[in-house]
Every structure is written in structure tokens, then in C-alpha cells.
């Protein structure tokens, strides 16, 4: 069986930049979290580059109970980033659907409690696969897990977002126009050097947006490492990390997942050797599996969607790196991302030159 992290990565001491008054958090939980009546031990998960995530362990009359807390990072933040209230809202809205999400306990937008907004959610026992190749897994398990990954993405995109109360969750207009503009702006705000391929993408992408305009809930960061699977079985028990969720285009999610997990261009993974890790689909095989579950008849303009996903992640990576330079990053890995933006942009521009 593959080794995998629980909930959101390895657990350690709270980093100095993210420390807060635990007693004030305890007092808040007694008022806002149903059944809470004990004292808290707080540890920090090492996973995640955006919003700091913590393991809360309550010790009280009912014994030990665990929760997970996510909060905004400290420091001056980009206006459209780290919107944890959106994470909380979308997971709460999806609670009654067939999309697996943790239970939401409380959202606090009062900065006086621990210094920033935060929310408390259910702690789940399961497997989070940090490596898309799933070392130690069998071919059958890899195949089953990636199939379930595609199936649950299709489930998300089938949710009627207006019926679950998310009709105002995204802005009107063309999703890709909106997103390209957003990530250009965020890249400019975090830019530290000139990257020719980023400039090419900034010119190309707005002029080549596909005509097809489906509208669904779009997770925004859907990939294997942001989901949790049953401890022993190949079925998903939670989709995590909803910070980038909006009302958008479903194929942005499909392409992002393929870019991140299956093409090996994110995080320095490199090309996947499927002879050594059988059972992992190619990007086109995953897209076909998604289409089967979604009732969709294929995907046109696939290279645009892939390139957009790489451009978007390039901008995100540059923002994380800039926060690291400024001392505000939520993870120690931030300073390793200095070349990530350039590498992703180069790959995106290369894909757009292809004729397939």
C-alpha cells in the first residue's frame, strides 16, 4: 500500500511567523464550535503554500477530538488572494451534494481573535497522495484512484451551483477573460524579473480564448494532492483546498489536473515514466475518463486549456516566491520556487507551438 500523508501533510511546531494566542482561540471555539469544551493543543501542517493550516486537538470531557483550522497568512496580501471565507462557503454549500467535503464548524472573520480570519473544519483520517506517481501503489490501485479522481471532478461540475446557494459566487462574463486578467495582474504585482515566455503568454492567451463557454463550479486547484482517499480503499472521502474556487469553466479544472499530475511540469516532477509506474493515465486518457463521467463528447482546443493552466500556476508560483522574499510565506518551500514561474511559462509557450 502506498504511503501517504494525512489531511494536509506532515505535522510540526507552529512556525514563528504564524503563532497566535491559543487561549483566545479556545475561548472562541467554546462559543462557536458545537460540543467544544476543552483545551487546545495546536500543531502546524507543513503542506500547502498559501493558507497556513493547523491541527487542533481538543482535550476535554469527551476525550480527545481533532479539528483542522485554516487561516490567512500574516502581512500585506494581494486583495484577491487568501479568501478563506470562500473556501468555507463552498464546502458548506456542497455538504448536501455527492461531492465529498469535510464538515464545516465555524468561520471567524474577526481579526482580533488570532490576528487574521480563519475557519475550523472536520479532521478526517485518510490518505493524501503527495506524489502523482503514487509510489508503492499497485497498477490496479493507481488506475482506480485516477478514475475516481475524474469521476468526482465530473460530480462537482454537475452540481447546480444556484440551487446550493452559490449563484453569486463568481463574476459575470467570460471566465477565461476574467482569469487571464486576474493572473496577469497578480503576476505583475509579484514580478521580480523579466520572463520572455510570460510576456508571450500575456499577449497570446487573451486573443485565443475558445468559443465554448460552459459554466459550472470550478475548484481551481483540483489535483491528486488536494484530495483525500479512504485509508485502504480507492475511493475519495474529501476534496480539499478550495481557496481558488469560483463559478467558471469545467475544462480549466480538467486541464489543471492533467498539467499538475500527469504531464510532470509542475513542482519539478519531470516527465512521468509510465513503464515504472503503470496504471497512471496520460493527460488525454484522463480527459476521456472525465468526459465519460460528465457525459461530454470530447474536448476541442486542449492545448489552450493546458497552456492557460500552466500560465496560471506560473503566476501563483511567482506570488508564493515573492511572499517568501518578503518573509510572509506559509511554507518553508516558498524559496525553492524561484525558477518555477519561468519553467512553467516556457512549457506553456512550447505547447502552444504544437500542431496536435
Where are these regions (language model features)?
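Juxta-kinase regulatory segment immediately upstream of eukaryotic protein kinase catalytic domains
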Residues: 2-36
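ATP-binding pocket architecture of kinase catalytic cores
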Residues: 39-217, 230-233
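Conserved beta-strand->loop/alpha-helix structural units within folded catalytic cores of enzymes
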Residues: 104-107, 225, 300
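All-alpha amphipathic helical-bundle segments outside canonical DNA-binding/catalytic cores
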Residues: 170-171, 297-309
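Catalytic-loop of the protein kinase fold
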Residues: 217-219, 224
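Catalytic activation segment of kinase domains across protein kinase-like and atypical kinase folds
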Residues: 228-256
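Active-site activation/catalytic loop segments of kinase-like enzymes and analogous catalytic loops
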Residues: 252-294, 308-326
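Helical subdomain adjoining the active site within ATP-dependent kinase catalytic cores
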Residues: 298-299, 315-356
Amino acid at each position: 500500500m502506498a504511503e501517504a500523508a494525512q489531511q494536509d501533510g506532515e505535522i510540526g511546531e507552529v512556525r514563528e511567523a504564524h503563532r497566535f494566542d491559543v487561549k483566545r482561540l479556545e475561548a472562541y471555539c467554546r462559543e462557536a464550535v458545537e460540543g467544544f469544551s476543552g483545551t487546545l493543543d495546536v500543531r502546524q501542517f507543513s503542506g500547502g503554500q498559501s493558507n497556513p493550516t493547523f491541527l487542533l486537538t481538543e482535550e476535554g470531557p469527551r476525550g480527545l477530538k481533532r479539528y483542522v483550522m485554516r487561516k490567512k497568512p500574516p502581512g500585506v496580501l494581494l486583495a484577491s488572494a487568501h479568501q478563506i471565507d470562500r473556501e468555507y462557503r463552498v464546502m458548506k454549500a456542497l455538504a448536501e451534494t455527492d461531492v465529498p467535503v469535510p464538515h464545516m464548524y465555524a468561520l471567524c472573520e474577526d481579526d482580533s481573535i488570532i490576528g487574521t480570519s480563519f475557519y475550523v473544519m472536520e479532521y478526517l483520517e485518510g490518505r493524501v497522495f503527495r506524489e502523482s506517481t503514487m509510489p508503492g501503489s499497485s497498477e490496479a490501485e493507481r488506475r482506480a484512484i485516477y478514475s475516481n479522481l475524474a469521476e468526482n471532478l465530473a460530480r462537482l461540475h454537475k452540481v447546480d451551483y444556484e440551487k446550493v446557494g452559490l449563484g453569486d459566487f463568481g463574476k459575470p462574463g467570460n471566465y477565461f477573460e476574467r482569469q487571464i486578467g486576474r493572473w496577469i495582474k497578480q503576476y505583475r504585482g509579484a514580478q521580480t524579473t523579466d520572463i520572455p515566455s510570460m510576456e508571450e503568454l500575456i499577449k497570446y492567451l487573451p486573443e485565443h480564448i475558445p468559443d465554448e463557454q460552459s459554466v459550472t463550479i470550478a475548484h481551481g486547484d483540483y489535483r491528486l494532492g488536494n484530495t483525500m482517499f479512504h485509508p485502504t480503499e480507492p475511493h475519495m472521502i474529501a476534496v480539499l483546498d478550495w481557496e481558488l474556487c469560483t463559478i467558471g469553466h469545467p475544462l480549466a479544472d480538467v486541464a489543471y489536473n492533467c498539467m499538475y499530475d500527469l504531464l510532470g511540469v509542475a513542482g519539478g516532477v519531470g516527465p512521468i515514466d509510465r513503464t515504472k509506474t503503470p496504471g497512471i493515465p496520460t493527460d488525454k486518457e484522463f480527459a476521456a475518463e472525465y468526459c465519460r463521467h460528465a457525459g461530454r463528447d470530447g474536448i476541442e482546443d486542449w492545448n489552450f486549456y493546458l497552456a492557460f493552466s500552466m500560465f496560471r500556476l506560473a503566476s501563483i508560483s511567482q506570488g508564493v516566491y515573492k511572499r517568501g522574499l518578503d518573509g510572509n510565506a506559509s511554507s518553508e518551500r516558498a524559496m525553492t520556487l524561484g525558477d518555477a514561474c519561468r519553467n512553467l511559462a516556457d512549457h506553456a509557450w512550447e505547447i502552444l507551438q504544437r500542431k496536435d
